[in-house]
Amino acid sequence: MSIDEFGGGQGPHPDVLVVTTNDVPGYEVTEVIGEVFGLTVRSRHLGSQIGAGLKSMVGGELKGLTKTLVETRSQAMERLVEQARARGANAVLMFRFDVAAAADVGTEVCAYGTAAVISPRV
């Protein structure tokens, strides 16, 4: 697997801008819609767990787990964008991820932020 397969985040969404900042340079917030989130929980695969355990003994990247986490984050972000779009937003401000263990059987990834309507400053 190449490093490109573990790229950071989703590609741009043409109708919903997602940023980690409070505002967008050159734009003004015309409406704050509120919190939106995208959530997914992935179960842990026994084979991956065994492989990860062995790999952790000798060191190095756990590529299978890295790939799963990238896919999981992408799915959570896509759900966040879908929710923002459904509520009439064209932007999500203060975007963040939260990752937690889910009852020792999986991993929960939550993408969250503030849905808003922005427009170019005139």
Model-identified regions with their sequence ranges:
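N-terminal presequence-like segments and the immediate start of the first folded domain
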Residues: M1-S48, T107-V122
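Terminal helix-to-tail segments of small alpha-helical proteins
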Residues: G8-D15, A52, L69, V81, ...
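Short, well-ordered alpha-helical segments
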Residues: V36, V41, Q49-R96
